[in-house]
Amino acid sequence: MQLVILRVTIFLPWCFAVPVPPAADHKGWDFVEGYFHQFFLTKKESPLLTQETQTQLLQQFHRNGTDLLDMQMHALLHQPHCGVPDGSDTSISPGRCKWNKHTLTYRIINYPHDMKPSAVKDSIYNAVSIWSNVTPLIFQQVQNGDADIKVSFWQWAHEDGWPFDGPGGILGHAFLPNSGNPGVVHFDKNEHWSASDTGYNLFLVATHEIGHSLGLQHSGNQSSIMYPTYWYHDPRTFQLSADDIQRIQHLYGEKCSSDIP
């Protein structure tokens, strides 16, 4: 099973990614160990804090490879973030994990308790538009039947093998284009979702998760929407970073004037 998760997702370099069950809420090194087991797929019996795995973690959060796992790093690890395990490569996916077409349908299957359906629809529309604005991709919403990208809200265990963990943990996850469930995007229904700066802004998290569903890995650039942890940006002024644009255009190409309606 291939998947991408946002604690608000993480991909292996060959575009294989699966979400991981939540870790216990430990402090200090116990938490770091749990984090590594979750997001770097280390074996329980293997040495944990090897130089290689520590370097991976530091690179994931765009920090100098000589830094120590200090209080600032511990704080970063406790931020709500994507729950998909990451490999050592956070650059452009060498496998070019992508859809083989430019017109994609999407469907919102259900809604959270704390947002009006119209606000959810606007947030998802704006999220897909962020990606279509810089690529030849065209997104069309459908109300019924199958769709390429399927958006839904769930809580705890929800029959995909990757349960959510309640408020403040994993915010969402998404399956990759070449997975057994391409385009599936799940959000944790236990989170407080909004169209503003209260709780978690659905537009921002959806932009991240849909990026994964299009084939993007996480970025180590903190200005990127594909950065592993959730950071609030004003949706009214939000723009993709140069890193985001470069990587999505690497998969789908640039938007030509003929692509503009």
UniProtKB/Swiss-Prot annotation:
Span of the signal peptide: 1-17
Main location as per UniProt: secreted
Residues that coordinate or bind Zn(2+): C82, H208, H212, H218
Span of the annotated motif Cysteine switch: 80-87
Recorded GO MF terms: metalloendopeptidase activity; zinc ion binding
A GO BP entry: collagen catabolic process
Alphabetized Pfam families for the sequence: Peptidase_M10
GO CC, alphabetical: extracellular matrix; extracellular space
UniProt propeptide residues: 18-89
Carbohydrate-modified residues: N64, N221
Functional description taken from the UniProt entry: May hydrolyze collagen type IV, fibronectin, fibrinogen, beta-casein, type I gelatin and alpha-1 proteinase inhibitor. Is also able to activate progelatinase B.
Name of the protein this chain belongs to: Matrix metalloproteinase-26
Native source organism of the sequence: Homo sapiens (Human)
